[in-house]
Amino acid sequence: MRGSRLGRDPTAKRFGENAAAALLLTFTVVAILWANSPWAHTYSEFWETPVGLSFGELHGELTLKELVNDALMAFFFFIVGLEVKAQFTIGELTERSRAVVPVVAAIAGLTLPAVIFLLFNPSGEDASAWGVVISTDTAFLVGALAIIAPKYPARLRTFLLTLAVVDDVGALAAIALFYSDRIRVVALLIAVVLLAALIGVRHLPAAARGLTYSVLAVALWLALSAGGVHPTLAGVAVALVIPVFTPERQRVEAAVEVIRAFRQSPNSQYARAATRSLRDSISINERLVTGFGPYVSFGVLPLFALANAGVRLDADTVMAAIRSPLTWGVVAGLVVGKLVGITGATWIVRRIGLGRLSPGLTLRRVAGGAALSGIGFTISLFIVDLAIKDPRSADLARVGVLAASLIAFASGWAIFRLTDWFSPPVAVGHRLVRDVDPDRDHLRGPVDAPLTLVEYGDFECPFCSRATGSIDEVRAHFGDQLRYVWRHLPLERVHPRALDAARASEAAALQGKFFDMGTIMFQFQDFLEWQHIYRYADQVGCDIARFDDDLHSPRVLHRVDDDTQDAELMDLSATPTFFVNGVRHRGPWDSASLIRALEASRPGSP
């Protein structure tokens, strides 16, 4: 069976990310053109326009630039905080084995750029601007990766996004610890009380949570601002106390029941109940990222670029930047520090055996991504505004950020192109990208058998079901000479229950029931709803409580995703797909054909 896309369709999401990066770049160019046009004086005049709000005798006033940097950017940091919370709770950073390399690389990519910057600016006011070079702009990073378009970027993209999460944590910590004003204890104590109240909001009735979160978040922003801490960190603080979870079976099934009732008797009461039930089956963290994310990407960040990227690039500024250790410190920190820090740390971690890269991800690919990580736009410009008070020096730092971003993009492009030229990729999908691992893979037959047959399959695919008979005959023919390996390739576009079935098989595998569960799901392919899957798990002897916990664990989902990403790396789009002794089998998959292919793969065969 063929599917047009593997796993959850990422096209719309990636298109949105690329469009957001393009819009951010467009507004950056507009800001630079505006600041260098005959109307350049209107740029600063416009962003210094005061905006006030009065309530009785109370009066507050911000400039338009402060409104963007201090208020609207709180939403950006809110989204960053939500994504950090999700990654550490249910995402890539829940498993040490997959997190250690990008985490260590990110730490090196934070520290080495700062050290290099301080070599250029060891003292004086400019030395405090070391935070400008520590962060990577995730939006531009994703957009640059899409423009350069290295082949099969899935694993590299996951690595870089994981790295970016740790990068964001470091940048947020730097802002909180080193770039806040004089601390006012009373206001901060009020902020702590408000934060405790935010933690308790989850216990309120669902209908009251949204408004309560909003009111307390605004109050926290005001308290942090009064307390001397940069108020945008209110967004992070609120995000970190908002709960996140994977969809729970009970809530999903409850939503299905309400929808079924609405289908049988459509009315406004059932419609409201169905909407509420569907909403509550997804964590508020995910709903907020989905709801606010586009406004941040297509509204807040472009406005931030327009307000902060307007650097006057006249001859005097350019010559001053060329002679300025501040500018060179920013460029060297971002371009050299990120490339050497991330790549070097990755090499060291692999060398000493502390961690390993995902299958198909090489150090050369990491180097290209590390170079792109030198695009430190959004938070870099944000910290320029916090760390440097002198307008002339701030402009020189902004020139450094813009120059570093261009050089980092060019460096990443060159590394990807040169490594592909000197080390051309092998034919896609001809060989397995990941060797069989007896400690990880699902095997039948002796571990040390001389012949290996690997199948990428889908439990809802009728052809995979028919192939099980062929596999049984092949195994009977070779006996102990053959080991058979199953790997997942759920084609969700054509088999909507395939991913759930794959997860169920992995949850059963944790109780030693993988092939038992697979056999019964193949027998009843038309009945793979959750109530059926739980019945099958019970029939094969699984502990249902443990099965339910494992089914919704990140470990199980990542295990299926690993196989799916391997398949994407090899450009597999059909099931079943077989590999005979590591080489792709492109002929028929009846038992006779598979037996001939296995016999021909023996050493010394003609």
PLM features: residue spans?
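C-terminal cap of thioredoxin/glutaredoxin-like
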Residues: 454-457, 466-473, 534-606
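Membrane-interfacial segments at transmembrane helix termini in multi-pass membrane proteins
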Residues: 243-266, 350-360, 401-440
